[in-house]
Amino acid sequence: MSIEPLTDEERADALDALPDWDYDDGRDAISRSFTFPDFSAAFAFMTRVALYAEKHDHHPEWSNVWNRVDILLTTHDAGGLSHRDVAMAEAIEALAE
């Protein structure tokens, strides 16, 4: 099954539903930064996201410096943003709470 990139309308709807995420036009990706009280909380969040990512075979591009986690989502197989990224962003939002 091939993964298709979002249409312009689907992308706009997804961005409306994910107001804290920024669209990166150059990479056809979405990104968000999360800040936590300390490194342990940031790392615990990353662990929850990693378990979700592994279960769904869809992995973020991310970095961590102390209490901050930066996440970028795009689907390389689709050549840009796909429904998999939107689903992962929604899951990440829930995991951050």
Swiss-Prot record:
Catalytic activities: (4aS,6R)-4a-hydroxy-L-erythro-5,6,7,8-tetrahydrobiopterin = (6R)-L-erythro-6,7-dihydrobiopterin + H2O
The protein's Enzyme Commission number: 4.2.1.96
InterPro entries the UniProt entry points to: PCD_sf, Pterin_deHydtase
Top-rank taxon, per record: Bacteria
UniProt keyword list: Lyase
MF-aspect GO terms: 4-alpha-hydroxytetrahydrobiopterin dehydratase activity
Any one of the GO BP annotations: tetrahydrobiopterin biosynthetic process
Family: Belongs to the pterin-4-alpha-carbinolamine dehydratase family.
Classification via HAMAP family: Pterin_4_alpha
Name of this protein: Putative pterin-4-alpha-carbinolamine dehydratase
Native species: Rhizorhabdus wittichii (strain DSM 6014 / CCUG 31198 / JCM 15750 / NBRC 105917 / EY 4224 / RW1)
